[in-house]
Amino acid sequence: MLNKLSLLLKDAGISLTDHQKNQLIAYVNMLHKWNKAYNLTSVRDPNEMLVRHILDSIVVAPYLQGERFIDVGSGPGLPGIPLSIVRPEAHFTLLDSLGKRVRFLRQVQHELKLENIEPVQSRVEEFPSEPPFDGVISRAFASLNDMVSWCHHLPGEQGRFYALKGQMPEDEIALLPEEYQVESVVKLQVPALDGERHLVVIKANKI
């Protein structure tokens, strides 16, 4: 699996240390193991997880601005855990409402000794925003409109929303409230992955 990951990273132009690669593989192995009992993801094959979960998450890392992020609807830690491994200097709060997912996240935190993550079981509407976050990240969580509506209290004055999407979500962008501005839409290159991937970066015009 290490060879496959190394080839994928090379194709994506991403450089990681051996320690980071081993952490990513350990995470995939844990996800594969726990998935049999907890049904954390529909992806069953660990090699497929490397592409659809690991690479699909970490290609976002260069576009994240700031040091303090919250992964909303994190599920089994996607994209938060892969991002925390490739951005060890940043801190990631992993928010999910389901206990079984948060238990898995805490086990990953313990086994991989990830000191820059904080798994939290909560609904996003009830989660406090003090201090506010530099970035609010979501992957397959909600529409853009719902994301900014439910998470409006989380980013700081210079904070951003980072929404990981498949095809270009033009309809969702058109429905955004006027106080939110799309700063950029990045077409992501994910080697070995069929279909399009986009990152939508939204700025809240907070006064």
UniProtKB/Swiss-Prot annotation:
| Residues holding S-adenosyl-L-methionine | 73, 78, 124-125, 139
Annotated Gene3D superfamilies: Vaccinia Virus protein VP39
**What are the coiled-coil residue ranges?**
none
> Keywords for this entry?
Cytoplasm, Methyltransferase, rRNA processing, S-adenosyl-L-methionine, Transferase
Q: What class of enzyme is it?
A: transferase
Example of a GO cellular component annotation carried by this entry: cytosol
Record localization: Cytoplasm
What reaction(s) does this enzyme catalyze?
guanosine(527) in 16S rRNA + S-adenosyl-L-methionine = N(7)-methylguanosine(527) in 16S rRNA + S-adenosyl-L-homocysteine
GO MF term (any one): rRNA (guanine-N7-)-methyltransferase activity
Q: Could you say which EC number(s) this protein's record lists?
A: 2.1.1.170
The similarity comment for this entry is:
Belongs to the methyltransferase superfamily. RNA methyltransferase RsmG family.
Q: What's this chain's function? A: Specifically methylates the N7 position of guanine in position 527 of 16S rRNA.
Query: What NCBIfam families does the entry give?
Result: rsmG_gidB
Protein name according to UniProt: Ribosomal RNA small subunit methyltransferase G
The record's gene field reads: rsmG
